Amino acid sequence: MKTREEALALDRDDPLAPLREQFALPAGVIYLDGNSLGAQPRAAAARAQQVIGAEWGEGLIRSWNTAGWFALPRRLGDRLAPLIGAADDEVAITDTISINLFKLLAAMLRHQARHAPKRRVIVSERSNFPTDLYIAQGLIAQLDRDYELRLIDDPADLPDALDDETAVAMITHVNYRTGYMHDMPSVTQTVRQAGALMLWDLAHSAGAVPVDLNGALADGAVGCTYKYLNGGPGSPAFVWVPKRHQRAFEQPLSGWWGHRAPFAMQPAFEPDPGIARFLCGTQPIVSMSMVECGLDVFAQTDMHAIRRKSLALTDAFVALVESRCAGQPLKLVTPRAHHQRGSQASFEHPHGYEVMQALIARGVIGDYREPRILRFGFTPLYTRFVDVWDAVETLRDILDTEAWRAPEFATRAAVT
């Protein structure tokens, strides 16, 4: 892709192009931040009005039954399941990634303590998203025996970090900064052969790249719905537990929604035999309902078509940045190899924050991550090839003119 006309031609031939019309994208904006917050499905506003106006406003408490609110976490989990290689009754939409990580990690450590008490080490990456590490640190601080969080600095170091004391490997499939993607089947096999349990974080994978959790024989996973799945800001996350583990994994947040019969109101907790045991308290129905609007769009295509376009978009973006912005202090930190790349492209720049603010001011929305990382997410359901061209041209002009040096672009916002 060497001209804007070529980009437009690619858009005309794109089989996913019609899906863009199902998103409410503002005019004059090139949105390359779907890896942080997905765009709004057009159906979401009407769905919100339906839930608030009719189901809540008119149905009131009856809607737990008549509108299917009570079954929503499991029903939507079943709809999400094919996107991550899961089966029915293995996924629940609920809580946040942080809370679901706590549940699963605690359940896995408890399981190992019963069957292999010597195993007390959690292995993860130093570059993992901080909440994963914070949750592990907080959980370790609460346990009454010596546990250890062992961090590796390179994916190649994982085999050497695993030993007969390893309980769980907690790895994020696609790195949030760089977009590096692990080989899920290979990593899972390595971890399981070492006698440890494999816990995946799919925050930057679900809806972005094909995932096959059951095919990889993973032991558990968490993910969010507000990024590539377009569930809306703060939409609930998901938890996956394969059927072979569900009865054996006992999560610590034994709230009433995880009981086998919540409305029996029994004084003693008896966990649900299926994935519902990983629920805790009353669910956020309004925000959860929005998740279905994003899943409705995914039902019109498949992850292989999405992946093909994702790679084409990121290939084009990287090539254009390196040709059109040649001579600028930009360093690609995202892998070039397709099998190691998620659905983003990240570049390091000495003044990355200021450059990104200048881009946003001109309607090209990506985001910034420390240290010095310009991060661009590509969501094939609505990102066009002409967006790639126009975004790079805007970046080139900002760098050539040093427009990023304007004082207002150095002011740090609370969210970057």
Curated annotation (Swiss-Prot):
It comes from the Bacteria. Pathway: Amino-acid degradation; L-kynurenine degradation; L-alanine and anthranilate from L-kynurenine: step 1/1; Cofactor biosynthesis; NAD(+) biosynthesis; quinolinate from L-kynurenine: step 2/3. InterPro entries: Kynureninase, PyrdxlP-dep_Trfase, PyrdxlP-dep_Trfase_major, PyrdxlP-dep_Trfase_small. GO terms for biological process: anthranilate metabolic process; L-kynurenine catabolic process; L-tryptophan catabolic process to kynurenine; NAD biosynthetic process; quinolinate biosynthetic process. Belongs to the kynureninase family. PANTHER family: KYNURENINASE. This is Kynureninase. The gene is kynU.
